[in-house]
A protein has these predicted regions:
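Beta-sandwich/jelly-roll carbohydrate-recognition scaffolds of carbohydrate-active enzymes
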Residues: 83-87, 91, 397-400, 407, ...
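Structured loops at beta-to-helix junctions and adjacent beta-edge loops in soluble globular domains
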Residues: 37-38, 63, 75-77, 85-89, ...
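Extended, charge-enriched "interface" segments that sit outside catalytic cores
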Residues: 2-108, 115-119
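Aromatic-lined, polymer-binding surfaces characteristic
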Residues: 94-107, 111-310, 314-325
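CBM-like, beta-strand-rich accessory domains located in the C-terminal region of large
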Residues: 171, 337-345, 358-372, 377-378, ...
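Acidic-aromatic substrate-binding/catalytic surfaces of carbohydrate-active enzymes
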Residues: 7, 31-40, 444-466, 470-491
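Carbohydrate-active enzyme catalytic cores, enriched for enzymes
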Residues: 271, 275-457, 508-513
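Extracellular structured ligand-interaction cores
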Residues: 115, 120-122, 406-408, 444-446, ...
């Protein structure tokens, strides 16, 4: 793309690319996306309040200068140039073909997983390099950025190669490039050596994205988080670069479609319809970026987006476990909108509550989030920090909460850090229904349980989107639910989507119990989970149907526990760190019980062995239902107290 052709796509009368770049460099910082104008002021706040984060930021930026990158907690080092076309894990090289010729490589028979490859090419480490340069003025950060971005542009010709295949990935990269540009734009070295190439490539990616949104790619597609991410990238690009002729279209069309999609993809109670909590986080982060621009006056007021975001964050509030982490329902590729807190546990969603505290003046969110997180600081700036300090923390009025449209139910005895808390799912299988539900798992009427603030029963997670263990992690046996006659609750398609989808619904709920129901091939299953006292819970499973059936139960335990199964006594003893933790009383009847090895993954691409209790019953169901009773009894009964912080450990 020539300079003249590029400048023809702008609204000004710039005579050269140098003039255009100087114009962007001279624009006030307030006209870009992050509300930070003074590196000295920001550096002082980081040193005073976020010293450990600041250390990690510079460590990551220094490593990136030597082509060493951290992806999902794993380090990948490149001795020469970064290989943008190869999977970092297997080194499998994607061909540089026209994007539509790559369809054959991307289906269910593709040779490797794509997530590490895409994470590498999202370029969120460019933001760290930019911040490090902006704070220090050290040229090595600029030099590394120039070297890497020029190499990427050279090795990724327009519409060729896997980095032009998925518009979602292009959108996240656009956001990262736009944020990084805010910090590099004043560098003479950047302007002279890479500025023109950078801006041309950025425009080409935005232009491509505007013509390849998810909703127009296929009539069979069900728009999901991809569409929301794509629209967010368009909107933010339109805000950051009003100099482009079509910037107003990117912004306005993107905004109209975003309101439409957010409304369509979110239940009225704030639960994301994909039934995948990791994508609930991802979408919340994207909406936060857009709502923040509205609050800053870069967009007109967005009451629908604000109301939806507040409800989504309220779901996060109640889905936060005593350990400070959220639930791992459904799939997750561990993607983040900005990646400003990569070192933190992905499942700690409290940074979102931290920002939401300020945006929506929520003292209860401040209580649970505990601190004004560094991610919130970057997005909301110094004024956001001042606002946070003025809000008085308050314990949430409710302990338990139901999200009936989303089908999520929370039972909690207190907001203390040693609370007993249960989370149960009883609702729609996923987004799109039959043949879709791409990121849902076979987990209806599954539940997770924390006793005395510690995890007991957990969701197994996702692990990976490719390979033989993909189906294990999304199957019923990886969740704390049941299988009828040896079948998953739905039939998985390769890698994504489900057939023969069923749904569950809630029968009744109160602050200390919940009952849900689904029907699988003529067998009605009703599960009732009840808190009967401090450290004590009961689980009643009732099955009704005709004929003889086989019922399988799965209880997937958290890592770090030990077990003693005494089948004759119908008790499973659970210990933690050598101390008694729980007695699980098993049902009477003709059962087979067995402790089996399971898997647990709370980071993409990493897994560890855990144990699970497997139980099987075979017999003829009674006409009015056959009841199986389980009870959980904590060995050390706590004294419930309202502590000053919820899940104080960060």
């Amino acid at each position: 793309m020539s300079d003249s052709k590029f400048l023809a796509e702008t609204t000004g009368d710039w005579q050269s690319m140098d003039d255009f770049l100087r114009h962007l460099a001279d624009r006030p910082a307030s006209s870009f996306l992050l509300p930070h104008a003074s590196p000295q002021e920001t550096a002082a706040i980081l040193s005073a309040h976020y010293a450990e984060y600041q250390k990690e930021l510079f460590f990551a930026a220094d490593a990136a200068c030597t082509n060493e990158l951290s992806l999902f907690g794993q380090t990948f080092a490149y001795s020469d140039e970064i290989d943008w076309q190869s999977d970092p894990v297997t080194k499998w090289h994607w061909p540089i073909l026209y994007r539509e010729s790559l369809n054959a490589f991307v289906g269910s028979t593709r040779p490797v997983d794509l997530i590490f490859f895409w994470e590498l090419n999202r370029h969120q480490h460019f933001i760290s390099l930019g911040i490090a340069y902006w704070l220090t003025g050290e040229q090595r950060y600029v030099s590394a950025f120039i070297r890497q971005v020029k190499n990427w542009i050279k090795t990724n010709p327009v519409q060729h190669g896997m980095n032009w295949y998925y518009p979602l990935e292009i959108s996240i990269r656009i956001i990262a490039w736009t944020m990084a540009f805010q910090f590099f734009r004043g560098s003479p070295e950047f302007q002279q050596e890479a500025g023109g190439e950078f801006m041309k490539s950025l425009w080409q990616q935005i232009d491509f994205l505007s013509c390849h949104l998810q909703s127009v790619r296929s009539k069979d597609d069900v728009p999901n988080n991809h569409m929301i991410a794509e629209l967010t990238g368009l909107i933010l690009a339109g805000i950051a670069f009003p100099e482009f002729n079509t910037a107003h279209k990117w912004r306005d069309v993107g905004l109209n479609l975003l309101v439409e999609q957010v409304t369509a993809q979110t239940h009225l109670d704030g639960v994301n319809k994909e039934q995948a909590t990791g994508y609930h986080r991802f979408v919340s982060e994207l909406l936060l970026l857009v709502v923040m621009q509205s609050r800053r006056g870069s967009l007109k007021p967005q009451p629908i987006l604000e109301a939806t975001l507040e409800k989504m964050l309220n779901y996060i509030l109640f889905s936060t476990a005593p350990t400070g982490t959220n639930q791992m329902w459904g799939d997750s590729d561990y993607g983040r909108a900005l990646g400003l807190g990569q070192k933190k546990d992905f499942w700690d969603f409290r940074p979102l509550l931290s920002a939401g505290t300020v945006l929506f003046n929520r003292p209860d969110w401040k209580f649970v989030s505990g601190r004004f997180d560094e991610e919130a600081f970057w997005i909301l700036g110094h004024e956001g920090m001042d606002h946070w300090k003025r809000i008085a923390s308050r314990i949430p009025e409710q302990t338990s909460c139901a999200f009936p449209q989303g089908g999520h139910f929370v039972i909690r005895d207190s907001w203390s850090a040693d609370s007993d808390t249960a989370f149960l799912r009883s609702g729609k299988f996923g987004l799109g229904g039959e043949g879709h539900c791409a990121h849902a798992h076979s987990d209806l009427l599954s539940f997770s349980l924390w006793l005395q603030g510690q995890p007991l029963l957990v969701d197994s997670g996702t692990y990976i989107y490719h390979g033989p263990l993909r189906d294990y992690f999304r199957s019923s046996c990886a969740h704390n639910t049941v299988m009828v006659d040896g079948h998953n609750q739905a039939a998985p398609n390769p890698n994504f989507n489900w057939r023969h989808v069923l749904n569950a619904r809630c029968l009744n709920w109160s602050a200390d119990h919940v009952s849900g129901i689904f029907n699988y091939r003529g067998v009605e299953f009703i599960r009732t989970l009840r808190r009967t006292g401090s450290g004590n819970w009961t689980l009643d499973d009732r099955f009704a149907g005709e004929g003889t059936h086989e019922i399988d139960w799965f209880f997937n335990f958290a890592p770090g526990l030990d077990f003693d199964l005494r089948e004759n006594d119908r008790i499973l003893f659970v210990t933690r760190a050598g101390s008694p933790f729980l007695k699980l009383h098993l049902p009477d009847g003709d059962f087979d019980f067995e402790l089996q090895l399971g898997w647990y993954s709370n980071q993409y691409g990493l897994k560890q062995r855990t144990q699970k209790l497997y139980a099987q019953w075979r017999g003829r169901l009674l006409e009015d239902g056959t009841l199986f009773h389980w009870s959980f009894e904590a060995d050390q009964i706590k004294s419930v107290s309202q502590r000053g912080e919820y899940a104080a450990a960060v």
